[in-house]
Design a protein with these regions (language model features):
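Extreme N-terminal starter segment of soluble prokaryotic enzymes
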Residues: 3-5
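Conserved SAM-binding loop
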Residues: 7, 131
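Acetyl-CoA-dependent GNAT
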Residues: 9-15, 20-102, 111, 117, ...
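Residue-level detector of high-confidence beta-strand sites
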Residues: 77, 150-152
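C-terminal "cap" of GNAT-fold acetyltransferases
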Residues: 90, 125, 132-139, 144-148, ...
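Conserved glycine-rich acetyl-CoA-binding loop
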Residues: 94, 98-112, 133-140, 144
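Conserved acyl-CoA
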Residues: 109-126
Length: 176
């Protein structure tokens, strides 16, 4: 893994690279659930969602798409968005790493950097995310970065590609 990793704000030019990491519809759905329509998606689809929909947030300054870069360019991506009016809870979403770099610590590092950003810069008290049970590599990456299953064991089912997928809720809280 590169020592020169930086988490920076998303640029519209990142979308082409992100789209190239999504190799099939199953990968798209694991990444985005039902948030996008038909497969394949385009760079314009991502940019439209980020600019026009503002990440399903109702107020400005609630949505933070970020890109992990090394000396060669983008290697990972995720979004951060507030889920409450008090701006104390951040939800991570659209978490993805360049498929050629998976299993090498990039995802864990990106999440750790994003956690630090959410706590230190955005002043969050808690960060949440959802992961599909059929995506064990992502689940274990999130756990390695510090996320834990909710004590309530909260999860829900969603129909994707004609199947019932279980989504497990994870969180990490600010340490006192």
């Amino acid at each position: 893994m590169s020592d020169n990793l930086k988490l920076r704000p998303y640029k519209s030019t990142d979308a082409e690279t992100i789209v190239s990491w999504i190799k099939d519809e199953r990968a798209l759905r694991k990444w985005s659930s039902d948030r996008y329509g038909d497969y394949p998606i385009t760079a314009e689809d991502i940019n439209h969602k980020y600019l026009d929909c503002n990440g399903d947030c109702e107020e400005p300054d609630n949505f933070y798409p970020m890109t992990l870069v090394d000396e060669g360019g983008p290697v990972g991506h995720l979004i951060l968005r507030y889920t409450d009016e008090a701006k104390s809870i951040i939800r991570f979403g659209f978490v993805i790493v360049d498929d050629s770099k998976r299993g090498r610590g990039y995802g864990k590092k990106m999440l750790q950097m994003a956690i630090r950003y959410a706590f230190d810069m955005l002043k969050a008290e808690k960060i949440t995310l959802g992961v599909f049970e059929n995506n064990p590599s992502a689940y274990y990456c999130y756990k390695a970065a510090g996320f834990r299953e909710l004590s309530t064991g909260k999860s829900f089912m969603i129909e994707i590609l004609g199947e019932q997928w279980k989504c497990i809720e994870l969180e990490v809280k600010r340490e006192c």
